């Protein structure tokens, strides 16, 4: 991790005003007592099979979700699209790839002949380096440059419903024969900027303080987390993490798993999307929606390592992405286009910032806190969130990168009063800790998860320091400007216009298909939330139960 000047991360604690307003009532009727029985997912019947696509030699059908599972009924986790091999009755009008005077790679990619035998993998399969009579003419010659993880991550996709895309459309290991170098002022290291990235800057910034918010109403807390993870295009309280549509099946190619049909970094120990255990953590968080006497302490700290802007024309896309676009049917088939969106995302990042977001939610037991005389400020002091955390790069160690320091005194977890000693970390004050970190290596994420599984409740500033030290190896998108994924379809590709129109429609249908409007309404002003095919009710502060049907005043 990097910083050329001292950046102080002093944890300034403040309490937010609690918003206890009830959500707007739904115009639909509330469920009767019978409706509180488990409601299973209900889908429409399959459509008729489409005509046989003459080029893909497949036909398709689809269905829709009518009602999502609710009140502990079966979730909607089955595919909405289906495909079947068929024998076409029409001829396929194939377009022959023609690179003209350029070199055609074995992958079909066209590159300039000046890129042959330069030591770079310009074709993506090294076929441009396979027939060289002399030593390669290296673009960077004898200059020392390293591959940039920020550059590799730039442009990564976003799913409008919060899912992690499986692959990236951009080949950010293509340099077009250039040796554009970017200097990291903290480590004095030079990195090579990929061709697809028009602008890349190493700029380390960090929040001056950890941002802390506390919520007494579960819905407000959950709503904040959900909206942080979906885009502004998605106004529904709906999240989807599980892939339901099969990857695109290419003609003459056996069906592959999502992992094999995606572009990953060379280091398999680093998760390319850098958000770990997301579904599991949201399920844990949702389990508190109908519980009472809980308080939620939300802690966030952000570190930016750099900024990027992608080229808006002439980008080099991965062969896999282009093949998957070609494998889309010209007619609109919902399941096929949904599968494409779940592979690459609904949008890509045209510009943004890279780094990491450290985010934890502490679930506190209000009754236990009141009984033992523990205040919210006591909990924060126990966790070390009243300390200064300094991120600095001493001059004498600039070449070794930055370091973080903090001193957490765990005696601060002991509170005395009325002749009693309360250990905040052990005496049932902190019920749970849920992590939503973005960025950092999988190793650090696993270490944090193992610590939580052992029952540790004091995930503190020291854990933040360990995580932050791994950001250089695995940065994540922390802010971005989005562009629709269909803008990347090359205009010269056969049927490009039709497929672009289909994909635009698919994004709209995708949001409408997985909408909380297909949930039964909750009672007493509760709000329906859709989480991975299952509807749940988030109750106002005076009610509880799976449908908010029980008054807390009874």
Curated annotation (Swiss-Prot):
Transmembrane segments annotated in the record for this chain: 233-240, 267-274, 376-383, 384-392
Record bears the keyword Cell membrane: no
InterPro entries attached to this UniProt entry: Growth_fac_rcpt_cys_sf, LDL_receptor-like_sf, LDLR_class-A_CS, LDrepeatLR_classA_rpt, MAC_perforin, MACPF, MACPF_CS, TSP1_rpt
Protein name: Complement component C9
Membrane topology: Multi-pass membrane protein
Site (Cleavage): 267-268
Positions of glycan attachment: 261, 409, 423
Residue intervals of the EGF-like domain: 519-549
Domain MACPF per the UniProt entry, residue ranges: 136-518
Activity regulation details: Membrane attack complex (MAC) assembly is inhibited by CD59, thereby protecting self-cells from damage during complement activation. CD59 acts by preventing incorporation of the multiple copies of C9 required for complete formation of the osmolytic pore. MAC assembly is also inhibited by clusterin (CLU) chaperones that inhibit polymerization of C9.
Keyword Disulfide bond attached: yes
TSP type-1 domain: residues covered: 40-93
GO biological process, one term: protein homooligomerization
Domain LDL-receptor class A positions: 97-134
Family indicated by similarity: Belongs to the complement C6/C7/C8/C9 family.
Cellular compartments per GO CC: extracellular space; membrane attack complex; other organism cell membrane; plasma membrane
One Pfam family in the UniProt entry: MACPF
Keywords linked to the UniProt accession: Complement alternate pathway, Complement pathway, Cytolysis, Disulfide bond, EGF-like domain, Glycoprotein, Immunity, Innate immunity, Membrane, Membrane attack complex, Secreted, Signal, Target cell membrane, Target membrane, Transmembrane, Transmembrane beta strand
Protein location: Secreted; Target cell membrane
UniProt signal peptide: 1-20
Function: Pore-forming component of the membrane attack complex (MAC), a multiprotein complex activated by the complement cascade, which inserts into a target cell membrane and forms a pore, leading to target cell membrane rupture and cell lysis. The MAC is initiated by proteolytic cleavage of C5 into complement C5b in response to the classical, alternative, lectin and GZMK complement pathways. The complement pathways consist in a cascade of proteins that leads to phagocytosis and breakdown of pathogens and signaling that strengthens the adaptive immune system.
Tissue specificity comment: Detected in blood serum (at protein level).
């Amino acid at each position: 991790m990097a910083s050329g000047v001292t950046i102080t991360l002093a944890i300034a604690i403040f309490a937010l005003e609690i918003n206890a307003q009830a959500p707007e009532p739904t115009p639909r009727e509330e469920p009767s007592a019978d409706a509180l029985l488990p409601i299973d997912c209900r889908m429409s019947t399959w459509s008729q099979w489409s005509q046989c696509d003459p080029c893909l030699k497949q036909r398709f059908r689809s269905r829709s979700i009518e009602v999502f599972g609710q009140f502990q009924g079966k979730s909607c986790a089955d595919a909405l699209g289906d495909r079947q091999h068929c024998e076409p009755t029409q001829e396929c009008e194939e377009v022959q790839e023609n690179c003209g005077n350029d070199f055609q790679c074995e992958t079909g990619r066209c590159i300039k002949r000046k890129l042959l035998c330069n030591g770079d993998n310009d074709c993506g399969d090294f076929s441009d380096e396979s027939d060289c009579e002399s030593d390669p003419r290296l673009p960077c010659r004898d200059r020392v440059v390293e591959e940039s993880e920020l550059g590799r991550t730039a442009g990564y996709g976003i799913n409008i419903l919060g899912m992690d895309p499986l692959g990236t459309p951009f080949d950010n290991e293509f340099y077009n024969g250039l040796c554009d170098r970017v200097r990291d002022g903290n480590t004095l290291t030079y990195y090579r900027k990929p061709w697809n990235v028009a602008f890349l800057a190493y700029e380390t910034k960090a929040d001056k303080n950890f941002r802390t918010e506390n919520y007494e109403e579960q819905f407000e807390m959950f709503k904040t987390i959900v909206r942080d993870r979906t885009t502004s295009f998605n106004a529904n309280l709906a999240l989807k993490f599980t892939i339901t549509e099969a990857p695109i099946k290419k003609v003459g190619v056996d069906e592959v798993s999502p992992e094999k049909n995606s572009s990953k970094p060379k280091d398999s120990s680093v998760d390319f999307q850098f958000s770990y255990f997301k579904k599991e953590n949201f399920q844990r968080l949702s389990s508190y929606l109908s519980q009472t006497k809980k308080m939620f302490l939300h802690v966030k700290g952000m570190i930016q390592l750099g900024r990027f802007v992608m080229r808006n024309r002439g980008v080099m896309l991965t062969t896999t992405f282009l093949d998957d676009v070609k494998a889309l049917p010209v007619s609109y088939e919902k399941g096929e286009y949904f599968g494409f969106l779940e592979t690459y995302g609904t949008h890509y990042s045209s510009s943004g910032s890279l780094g990491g977001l450290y985010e934890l939610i502490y679930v506190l037991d209000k009754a236990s806190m009141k009984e033992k005389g523990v205040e919210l400020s006591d909990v924060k002091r126990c966790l070390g969130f009243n300390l200064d955390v300094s991120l600095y790069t001493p001059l004498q160690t600039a070449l070794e990168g930055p370091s973080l320091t903090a001193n957490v005194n765990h005696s601060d977890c002991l509170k005395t009063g009325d002749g009693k000693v309360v250990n905040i970390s052990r005496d049932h004050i902190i019920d749970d800790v849920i992590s939503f970190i973005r960025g950092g290596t999988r190793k650090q994420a696993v270490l944090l998860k193992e610590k939580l599984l052992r029952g540790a409740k004091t995930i503190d500033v020291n854990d933040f320091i360990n995580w932050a030290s791994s950001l250089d190896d695995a940065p994540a998108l922390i802010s971005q400007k989005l562009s629709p994924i269909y803008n990347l379809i090359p205009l010269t590709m056969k049927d490009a216009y039709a497929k672009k129109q289909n994909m635009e429609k698919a994004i709209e249908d995708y949001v409408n298909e997985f909408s909380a409007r297909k949930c039964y309404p909750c009672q007493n002003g509760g709000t329906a939330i859709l989480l991975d095919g299952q509807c749940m009710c988030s109750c106002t502060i005076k009610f509880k139960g799976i449908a908010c049907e029980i008054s807390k005043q009874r």
